[in-house]
Amino acid sequence: MSENAIEGARVVQLEVPDLDGGLRAKLVSAAKALSPAGAAMCTIMFGLTQADDVYESPASSSDNGFPDLLMRPDMATARPLPWCEDTAAVLCDLYGPDGALYPVAPRTVLRTVADRCAELGFEARFAAEFELCVVHQGDDAVPLGRTMNAYSLLRLRELRPLAQAFFERMEAVGIPIESVHTELGHGMLEFAISHAPAGEAADHAARAKAYLKELCGEMGLVATFMPKWRSGAPTSGCHFHQSLWRDGDNAFWSDDGGLSALARQYLAGQLVTMADVSVLFNPSVNAYRRLQPGTWTPVTASWGVDNRTAAIRAIAGSPKGARLEHRRAGADVNPYLAIAAMLAGGLHGIAEKLEAPDPATGDAVADGRFPRLATTLADAVDALRGSEVAPGLLGREFVDHYLLSREVELRLWREWEAEQVTEWEHRRYFETS
């Protein structure tokens, strides 16, 4: 796509990913979108929590007057939105007052890592799979459908109108959805996106989530990517498939039918950095309610061949299909930051020529060779704060700002939690005390 998509529109939706992976947007005229002066967005966007609590940071505060950022459209992402009359959408890169790419912006973080990969002669390709729950609008939040079976033909009757509309919309904006199917649990679904270069894959993931939410709203539904949306409900994760390519060939493939030596170095780098950057895969308090043993959710920095109990599942497959599946992230993940963390970790392994341990051959959780990962947001924040390698992987300024954002999230949670009296406490102590 190009400027033609914008020139044919009356209104342009300028989209920017925030720290939590949501798309913030501004509607402008086509003339404004194409103007060399561009549109602006206040730096406070990176001083907002997911619920829009405001906090100050060195990047945006009363000390510097909360300056503007320049929104520069990435015309490769310009798309007409057929479901919105005379409207196009385009993702934007953000530039600071100094004229440089804004280092805190998730798109900038990923671009920097992807450029590093390109300098080594590789193209990184990623594909995301998202699990989610769809419920009917209303205070009762009744899940879509009456049955809870995975891969259910029966449930497809209930799902089909939403799935078909989703396929149509994604095709219209150039997002290649490979599949949609039911998952275990009432209202639980999964969709998979085809692989693409790292930055494009993140764009696809962020847009697919946002546009699916919009579609569900039009149909009287709500789509939630909350990892555990209510007590007793199944959980939602996000799995990323990844590989490196050079001159049209998959660098993860070995002629002996297994993973190449380079793939094992890349894998080793992800394993040794996983604990440090775990908060980027699981960025919320709720994310850790998903990470329980025995639920196919990885709790160790582990790997195995076609092993779904491990954090990284190696799939040798074929010359075109050899890849690694990273299974740690929750569905609330920011795809830009997760892909940046995975790719940076893998490149670290290649640069240091790290060796991966032998794979887990059974339950990776029970394999004592693999270190445990954070089980709370507080532990994950501490791991990033104490990391010696993360600033080099993702940039000091970004790491410091992201730490601040998660510390704010923790503080707000602890303040709320301190005021709560649980049902368990009430049942146990009300009459006996």
Predicted regions: what they are:
Residues L221-V222, R246-S433:
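Catalytic-core signal marking the mid-to-C-terminal active-site face
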Residues P143-L153, H186-A201, R230-T235, D247-F252:
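Active-site-proximal beta-alpha loop/turn segments in soluble metabolic enzymes
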Residues F130-V134, E183-F191:
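Short, conserved phosphate-binding/catalytic loop or strand-edge motifs used
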Residues M1-S179, R372-S433:
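ATP/Mg2+-dependent ligation/transfer catalytic cores
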Residues R79-D86, E123-R125, V180-L184, A233, ...:
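Short glycine/proline-enriched loop/turn "hinge" motifs that connect secondary-structure elements
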Residues D18-D20, Y95-L101, R155, H195-A201, ...:
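A generic structural motif
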Residues A201-Q270:
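Acidic, glycine-rich loop-and-beta core segments that form the ion-binding/anion-interacting portion
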Residues L156-L159, A163-F166, E171-I177, F191-A198, ...:
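Accessory "access/gating" subregions that flank catalytic or transport cores
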